[in-house]
Amino acid sequence: MEEKKRLHLIIADAELETVPPEILDHPAIVNYAKRRKKRPEKIILDSTYHHAALRQLEDGERRGRPDIVHICLLNALDSILNKEDRLRVYVHTRNDYVIYIKPETRLPRNYNRFIGLMENLFEKGAVPEDLELLRMEKKTLNELIEEINPDVVFIMHEEGELMIPKNFGKLLDKFKKPTVIVGGFPHGDFKSKVDGVKISLYREPLMAWTIVNEVIVSYEWEVIKKFKS
């Protein structure tokens, strides 16, 4: 049976991590962990609550942004493309962990519940453990791409070739297994080095979730219409 044509979307170098060892004893971390009745090393780093501690970290100004992953995943998983089983979404983190997400996964809309879910995932490796709707493995971005085995890789980058979303959708549609990489960080460049075609959808920088939306919708128009006509 011929494999379905799907878009593979990777949220890469995502600023999603548990609190690193070098700031475990920082008052901002200790107090937050105490309020939540958790051990400091088990909590997700979050700039909203831990900004004072982040000043002590390398790249601290861009770290602790699980909200970016949350919004990107909510938008992607609730898309028409995903409902039509034409999308696969992955999260690759700054520390080279990959989160595999089953298409039927329904993430919590509430941010605090999402954080709790991520903390369970980092601790257990899969949630829920019996269904593994979310599963985590130690893996680099390049290893994930090799596993997907795409026929093309596009990297969404502000210095890439400028292309309107509609035309990018048409370009994606030319391939059987296109893979698109979107940065899961607030600013700066990718930490991981990956070969691919750099594309920009607008003359100014866009937030990751906006890019995710534009990419998915541009591809939806090209793919879905063929199966609805």
UniProtKB/Swiss-Prot annotation:
InterPro entries: Alpha/beta_knot_MTases (IPR029028), Rbsml_bgen_MeTrfase_EMG1/NEP1 (IPR005304), Ribosome_NEP1_arc (IPR023503), tRNA_m1G_MTases_N (IPR029026). Disulfide bonds: none annotated. The record marks 65, 106, 109, 113 as: Interaction with substrate rRNA. It catalyses: a pseudouridine in rRNA + S-adenosyl-L-methionine = an N(1)-methylpseudouridine in rRNA + S-adenosyl-L-homocysteine + H(+). Pfam families: EMG1 (PF03587). One of its GO terms (molecular function) is rRNA (pseudouridine) methyltransferase activity. It comes from the Archaea. The keyword rRNA-binding applies. It is an enzyme of class 2 (transferase). Keywords: Methyltransferase, Ribosome biogenesis, RNA-binding, rRNA processing, rRNA-binding, S-adenosyl-L-methionine, Transferase. The record marks 67 as: Stabilizes Arg-65. S-adenosyl-L-methionine binds at residues 183, 188, 201-206. Gene3D superfamilies: 3.40.1280.10. Homodimer. This is Ribosomal RNA small subunit methyltransferase Nep1. It comes from Pyrococcus horikoshii (strain ATCC 700860 / DSM 12428 / JCM 9974 / NBRC 100139 / OT-3). The lineage of its organism: Archaea, Methanobacteriati, Methanobacteriota, Thermococci, Thermococcales. The gene is nep1.
